[in-house]
Amino acid sequence: MELNHEYGIMNTTPNIHAMIVAAGRGSRFGASIPKQYTLLQGQTLLQHSVARLAESAYIYQCLLVVAADDSTAQTLSFALPIYYAVGGAERWQSVQAGVEAMINAGADEADLVVIHDAARPAVPTHDIDAVIQAAMLEPYGAILATPVADTLKQSYIAANILSMPVHEAVLPHQHTQPELTINESDRDALHAYAQKTIDRSHMWQAQTPQVFRLGPLQQVLNYVAEHNLAITDEASAFEHLELPIRLVMGSRQNIKLTYPDDSILLTAILMAQFSSIVEIL
């Protein structure tokens, strides 16, 4: 797939558009409501995330991509003027719907779109500005990311070795995985085992915001749809086509609320950030 480069790196003063994807259900979080409406310090995650974007001098309004049956977003007050689009079943489909809405509203293909997760309310303002400034100098875009600090293990799933007959047990030196027929009643007996350690020297953890040229983003998402690709973020779509996306060093404060115990850490981070602002004032 070839993309038109005429609106690429030469346009270093593009218009900036912002989008927050808030159409997901957050099944891993385990709450009865979508996690973007979880309250932290008296506001929803979504309100916090919009407020962070509002602190950037580059952003003056925000598109919220919500589920078709969402009845909450429009009852909330936000720090930016808001307009809406209806998302899809997958994250990339929600982003695609947002891109189409922006283009239909008159956005140019050379413009930049800042895509942020509703569940990342603690992103520092200077990181938002840094990734936007980096994307201005790139033909396709840039994303926030942090180098992986922990040791990474690749795993395999097997029955507990101690509970298996000796001739069925899979030991580390065998480098194979047992053929298991998994019944619902057997799931509690399955465990993850370390298979190998992954070299982390070139590994980064992707964050948001992710910032892309609008035209190329539309094209790569169309490619994803046509080829039924499985992607976990928008940068993945560019990677499939071997198109360069710049990595911009982010902050480890910019965590995503994914599991219930993440809320404890996020609350502490938000309180510390607020205290720092008060001290400056």
Curated annotation (Swiss-Prot):
InterPro entries, per the entry: IspD, IspD/TarI, IspD/TarI_cytidylyltransf_bact, ISPD_synthase_CS, Nucleotide-diphossugar_trans
Pathway membership: Isoprenoid biosynthesis; isopentenyl diphosphate biosynthesis via DXP pathway; isopentenyl diphosphate from 1-deoxy-D-xylulose 5-phosphate: step 2/6
EC number(s) stated in the UniProt entry for this protein: 2.7.7.60
Record-annotated site: Transition state stabilizer: 28, 35
Keywords: Isoprene biosynthesis, Nucleotidyltransferase, Transferase
Site (Positions MEP for the nucleophilic attack): 200, 256
Keyword check for Glycosyltransferase: no
Catalytic activity: 2-C-methyl-D-erythritol 4-phosphate + CTP + H(+) = 4-CDP-2-C-methyl-D-erythritol + diphosphate
Biological process terms in GO annotation: isopentenyl diphosphate biosynthetic process, methylerythritol 4-phosphate pathway
Matching Gene3D superfamilies: Spore Coat Polysaccharide Biosynthesis Protein SpsA, Chain A (3.90.550.10)
GO MF terms held by the record: 2-C-methyl-D-erythritol 4-phosphate cytidylyltransferase activity
HAMAP family the UniProt entry points to: IspD (MF_00108)
PANTHER family: 2-C-METHYL-D-ERYTHRITOL 4-PHOSPHATE CYTIDYLYLTRANSFERASE, CHLOROPLASTIC
Family note: Belongs to the IspD/TarI cytidylyltransferase family. IspD subfamily.
Function: Catalyzes the formation of 4-diphosphocytidyl-2-C-methyl-D-erythritol from CTP and 2-C-methyl-D-erythritol 4-phosphate (MEP).
Name of the featured protein: 2-C-methyl-D-erythritol 4-phosphate cytidylyltransferase
Species per Swiss-Prot/TrEMBL record: Psychrobacter arcticus (strain DSM 17307 / VKM B-2377 / 273-4)
Gene: ispD
